[in-house]
Amino acid sequence: MTTSFEELTDSYKCIFFDAFGVLKSSAGLYPGVLDRLRSLRERGKEIFLVTNDASKSPHRMVEAYSHPEAGPMFPLERIISSGLLASDYLKNKVRSGWVAYMGKDAASFYIADVGLHPVPIGQLNLDEHSPKALVLLDDEGFDWFDDLNRAVNLIRQHNIPVVVANSDIT
C-alpha cells in the first residue's frame, strides 16, 4: 500500500524540510516544490526550512530560497540554520572577545551578529587575538592545508570550544 504525500502530512501540524537536495539542487527547484509548499500552507500546516548551510546570513538564505515569480518560499522566522544554532551557543557561552572561524567571509555574520569579533583562521595572529572559540562555518573560504593545520594547532594549544556548524567539513 502506498501512502500519498497529502495522507502522510495530514498526521502532522508542522513539517520541516531539509534545504539542499530536498527542495532544490544546484540546477534549481525540483518540479512541484512550489505547489507542495502552497498546498501545505492552504491546509494550515506550519512549514520550516532546516539547513546545515552556515555560509550565508538568514536574510541571504531567504533570497536563496526565493522564486522569481512566487517570492520567498520561507519567511525569515521559518528558517533554522546551523549558523543560527552556532550564534546561540556563542551568545550564551562565549559572550565576548575574538572568535576564530573557518569559512567564507559572509559566514562571519553568525559571530558578529551576537557582538563577538570574528577573525578568519588564516588571519589569526595570537599576539593580536586571543580567540575564545573556533567555529567551523563552511567548507569553502579558507586554505585547506594551511588553515586546517592552524585550526588543529589552535585547539591543541588552547582549551577553547570548537563549534561545528557545518558538518560537511568534518
Residue ranges and their predicted role:
Residues 1-170:
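HAD-like aspartate-dependent phosphatase fold
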